[in-house]
Each structure stands twice: as C-alpha cells, then as structure tokens.
C-alpha cells in the first residue's frame, strides 16, 4: 500500500509502527458552530481511509479531537450570551448527530482540549525547561527558529515565514515576541469573563497548536503512523505541531502526513469557508437530501483532490446509488428463486479480477475514482448475468458479499427493515400474479395501482414478480 506523504511530497510504502495496527490522529472541529460541507470533507475522507484499512485487516486506533476553547469559541459565546462550555456541549452534540447521519464510524476516542489542561501545562513547561519556549507577561511563545526543519511540511523557508508573520502580527505581539515567526503555546487571560485556568505563568488558556500535540502524543504515543487534516492545516497548525512535539520528545512525531483537498463552490470554484460566507452546513443540507447520497458524493473523489459541490453532482451520486441498490435487490431475488444453479467460471474469474483491481486502486493512495469505476463495471457484469435463465448462485453470493463490503468502505449500507405491512403486500402481489395467470388484466391493473398507492414498485421478470418500496 502506498500513501502520499505531505512532508516528503511523494508516495511512500505504508509501513506501520506495529504490524497489523494503524495509529491515526485527525484534527477535529472547533465546536463554535455546525460543521459545513467543507469540514465534512475531512471527516468523510479519513473515515473512508480508516474503513479501507479495516477492510484490509488492520486494527485502527483512530483519535479525533474537539477544539473546545480558542478565540472563536470565546467570541461566539459572548455573541450568544452563553458560556464557552455550554456552546461546546451544544455543537459537539450536533457534530455527533450529523456524523452519525453520514454513517461516520465514531473515533476510538474524541478527546477535548479543556479536559487536558494539566497535560498541556506540563508540556509547555517542558518546552520552557528545554530552552525552546519563553514567557512574557503571562503569554508563552515557542522559539520557532530553534527547530531546524521549521517550514519543511508547508514547503516554506525562514525568509518566507518571516515575511508572512510580519504581515499578520499586531503591535502587542510584536512587542512581546523575540522573533515574528514565534507562536503562542499559552495565552494570558485578557478579560475577567474570559475562560481561563491557573498556570505557572498566571491565568490563561492553551494555544490552538499545543492542544493537538498533547492529545495525539497522550493517546497514541510520541510517534504515530498517520496524522490527517485539511490542506489549510499544513501551516501553521501542523507545522507547529511538529516543532512542539519533536522538541519535547526528541522523536519523529508522525510517519505519514495526509491532507485532504478543499470543497469548492460555484463556477469560480471558490473554497467553501465561513469567512467567505459561501458555506452550507451539514445540519441544513441533511434536511433536504438523503445523508447517504451526500456521503457517497463526498467519497467519490480521491481525498487529495478538490471536489466541487453541486446539485448535479449530488443527483449523479443518487443515480449511481440507486443502481447499486437495485443490483443488490436483483441478486437477492435470484439467490432466493427456485431455479437450479449453473456453474459459470467466467463470472467467477470476473469476481477474482475485480477484487484484485479494486485493492490495487485503493492501495495506490486511496484512488477511489478507479475503485468506483471497478465497482460500477462489476455491477454491470452482475446485472447481465442475472438476466440468464440459470445463474451461478455460489458466485452470486460471493459477488453480493463483495459489493456490500466495498459499499461499506464508502459508508453506504442498504438495510431495508421489514415493515409491518409486508405480509399484506405479499398477499396483494400473489393476488396480482393470480390475476395475470388468469389473464384478468383489469384486476391485475387495479392491484398494481393499489400497490403503487402504498409506495410499492413492481418489476415483472422472467423469474417472477419483484417488488420494493419507492
């Protein structure tokens, strides 16, 4: 299996720290609002990657945090006349509801920054003791220039970093920092109503970057296999995480850095973001469309590539999903009919080849486009085979299992629960079959209309009548 490593800018053979196990840390949301489609891209992309690792037999330890204290949290809490704690609780609950609807597997652990304050303070103090951090008026900064490879992840040199920092730093920070490229590890409390904790440097709160360094190393160890997040986190967030973590532990922080592409919108394909006011929240969009359609659509583009969010794209995803659903229904119908089985070596060879090609595609840095193309072709092969008078039922059982497993990698699961009126529907189907047998077309049409009024779709096939709910 090959994974594109942002740090080296190339695909590398994936070799986990422990055979058969994968440690993954993915930066989670800052919980001051509902997540938008752009935020969901990262959640969906890394859930798909996690599911594929599990499909390949790996045991995945997946940690994804909640940033429940920072400037955005404080400002939003003031605006809504509530506390940071209550704001966080509300939007963590909303996040879990939205991601459950999108069939995202819960992380092994969802740590929260505010629950790790002691560990954060200890981490910062360790960096001060090592001489790579310093305190000024209750704020603590990291000496970025002390870290030899600072800028490597985002492919920037010190001169570029200095120029960028000089443009964004305010006068107060400039007077405190030894160097414009230094960044905050701990922020002093500015106002009485601001959330804060006691520390050796006075009341304050953690900086954003230190939170993830502490939570990832606490729960996954000093070195982890994979650290993921959106491309916008490469700098400064992930760059700073590397500097902090490696300065503290003296060990390589992450073996494979993975970053997902943006969601864009409109003809100009602008990045979806709250700052541009061009975003759609998952909470709102799920009132209008099937969560499974959104999930499949967002999974259909290789994780590093941008995806342009559009209604046409969603409709196309819905059409493809219906095709897979119908294929699985037709498979069930043929597996349950009374016709004898007929061995088909051609179909068996097709299944073996399709599985090998699917794995080859996904092993190549999770190339979902190629993998989905193989899935689509397999569905075509199966639908053609299902038209035959006699089918290879053992091969079809294998095909059904394969297709279901592949769809589950993309978070798709077609589970039709038996309704209370299924027995009634079966009786009406039997009555209609009898009417057709007796060539009583008027009664047959009447029963079809009655079934349609109940939301039942009927298919008349050479193997008998099939039905499903619309």
Curated annotation (Swiss-Prot):
EC number: 6.1.1.16
Subcellular location: Cytoplasm
Xref: SUPFAM superfamilies: Anticodon-binding domain of a subclass of class I aminoacyl-tRNA synthetases (SSF47323), Nucleotidylyl transferase (SSF52374)
GO molecular function, one term: cysteine-tRNA ligase activity
The protein, known as: Cysteine--tRNA ligase
NCBIfam families: cysS
Motif 'KMSKS' region per record, residues: 271-275
Residues binding Zn(2+), per UniProt: 27, 212, 237, 241
InterPro entries xrefs: Cys-tRNA-ligase, Cys-tRNA-synt_Ia_DALR, Cys-tRNA/MSH_ligase, CysS_C, Rossmann-like_a/b/a_fold, tRNA-synt_1_cat_dom, tRNAsynth_Ia_anticodon-bd
Gene Ontology, cellular component aspect: cytosol
Organism encoding this protein: Lactobacillus johnsonii (strain CNCM I-12250 / La1 / NCC 533)
Family as reported in the entry's similarity comment: Belongs to the class-I aminoacyl-tRNA synthetase family.
Name of the encoding gene: cysS
